[in-house]
């Protein structure tokens, strides 16, 4: 769907393998997520990158004709463009020419809601602009970009100074936000609250699953990057109090600058006790492998141990029994724990939450001896901090409360009760 009749032309420069077709399909979805309709496509099967245009001269002429015919607002390249290539292509076609990186930034800018995500996007854009400006100046000095330095060296220096100062201010503000987040994470641990983070390739159904697990009714549109800021809600998994967090979706070959910019958002994932890596099993096996590899690469680079990851094969209602068996073998071959669900149909949710409970770290159980008055006072705190498995009448008139939770929290509750026995 287009927004206000806006359109974009997709250009894929070098198709050198089968995986490129999947990236092309993904680019179509990104274009639509940015609010454009795909007016036309131009493909070139070549490993050679023309230094001036990225694509061959003949393809440039085809592109000009396509632009004249379709009259798009802009042209989008799958391949990364160098500053001189974007400049030359724009000059030839008469419209703005961007690459996949800039398209993703545009989507992020449209969907940013929180102050943090807006700052992160601005930071990534400014760093991109600064690197491009440096290259533009080098090209202008060599006479390849006529008129670029028309404002004089003073104007260029002023631009550098402004952007550099703005980058420093944003980074300082993000450091403060990061510190507040880390303090919040520490308070959660102090309170004994287990944390579960939903991650996965964009479009896998994370937000649908988040809504099912937490009873929320959050924003779902099926487009890439519906979630940019983290959203957390408290709930219970089989009696255990947990905080479930929905995080930004991954994408293949996400630029390092964007990963760096969204560090504070991804930090929520690193701090989680269990990471649910959601996959769309209605994809082809090749697509599932590609998306799993891309997602695992981000998680491992963040320092997430594989033992904390639970693969969640979503959308099982969209595949046949034979296809599901094939997908299950694929997940099994990953060597990670996995479970199969349909978030939309609420199939397999009980098994999913049970698997999460089994993975929660440092669980111990203990028996607390409490008077009825003490239990009445402490019941809310007990339920907020751990699972209450059983309450029975003791021989001395006290109530024996069997609880299960984090080791340090259970030990603290035991100390307050004045007695207790750790069962395991």
Swiss-Prot record:
GO terms for cellular component: cytoplasm. Mg(2+) binds at residues 207, 227. Pfam families: GTP-bdg_M, GTP-bdg_N, MMR_HSR1. The keyword Metal-binding applies. Its main location: cytoplasm. Its cofactor is Mg(2+). Residues 194-364 form the Hflx-type G domain. PANTHER family: GTP-BINDING PROTEIN HFLX, GTPASE HFLX. Monomer. Associates with the 50S ribosomal subunit. Belongs to the TRAFAC class OBG-HflX-like GTPase superfamily. HflX GTPase family. HAMAP family: GTPase_HflX (MF_00900). NCBIfam families: GTP_HflX. This is GTPase HflX.
């Amino acid at each position: 769907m287009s927004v206000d009749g806006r359109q974009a032309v997709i250009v894929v420069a070098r198709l050198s393998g089968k995986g490129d077709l999947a990236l092309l399909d993904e680019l179509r979805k990104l274009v639509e997520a940015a609010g454009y309709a795909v007016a036309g496509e131009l493909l070139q099967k070549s490993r050679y990158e023309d230094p001036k245009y990225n694509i061959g001269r003949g393809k440039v002429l085809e592109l000009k004709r396509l632009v004249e015919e379709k009259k798009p607002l802009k042209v989008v390249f799958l391949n990364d463009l160098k500053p001189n290539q974007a400049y030359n292509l724009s000059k030839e076609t008469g419209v703005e020419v961007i690459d996949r990186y800039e398209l993703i930034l545009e989507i992020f800018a449209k969907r940013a809601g929180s102050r943090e995500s807006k700052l992160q996007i601005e930071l990534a854009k400014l760093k991109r602009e600064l690197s491009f400006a440096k290259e533009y100046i080098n090209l202008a000095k060599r006479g390849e970009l006529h008129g670029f330095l028309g404002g004089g060296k003073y104007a260029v220096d002023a631009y550098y100074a402004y952007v550099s100062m703005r980058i420093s201010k944003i980074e300082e503000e993000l450091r403060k936000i990061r510190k507040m987040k880390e303090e919040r994470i520490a308070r959660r641990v102090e309170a004994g609250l287990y944390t579960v983070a939903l991650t996965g390739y964009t479009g896998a159904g994370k937000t649908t699953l988040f809504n099912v697990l937490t009873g929320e009714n959050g924003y779902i549109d099926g487009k890439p990057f519906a979630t940019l800021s983290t959203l957390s809600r408290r709930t219970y998994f089989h009696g255990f109090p947990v905080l479930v967090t929905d995080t930004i979706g991954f994408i293949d070959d996400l630029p390092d600058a964007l990963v760096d910019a969204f560090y504070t958002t991804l930090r929520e994932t690193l701090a989680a006790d269990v990471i649910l890596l959601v996959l769309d099993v209605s994809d082809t096996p090749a697509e599932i492998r590609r998306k799993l590899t891309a997602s695992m690469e981000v998680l491992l680079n963040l320092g997430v141990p594989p033992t904390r990851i639970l693969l969640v094969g979503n959308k099982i209602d969209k595949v046949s029994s034979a296809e599901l068996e094939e997908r299950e073998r694929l997940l099994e071959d990953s060597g990670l724990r996995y479970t199969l669900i349909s978030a939309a149909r609420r199939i397999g949710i009980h098994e999913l939450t049970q698997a999460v409970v089994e993975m929660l770290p440092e669980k111990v159980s203990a028996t607390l001896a409490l008077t009825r008055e003490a239990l009445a006072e402490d019941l809310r705190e007990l339920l907020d901090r751990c699972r209450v498995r059983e309450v029975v009448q003791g021989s001395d008139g006290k109530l024996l409360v069997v609880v299960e939770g984090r080791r340090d929290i259970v030990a603290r509750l035991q100390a307050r009760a004045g007695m207790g026995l750790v069962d395991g």
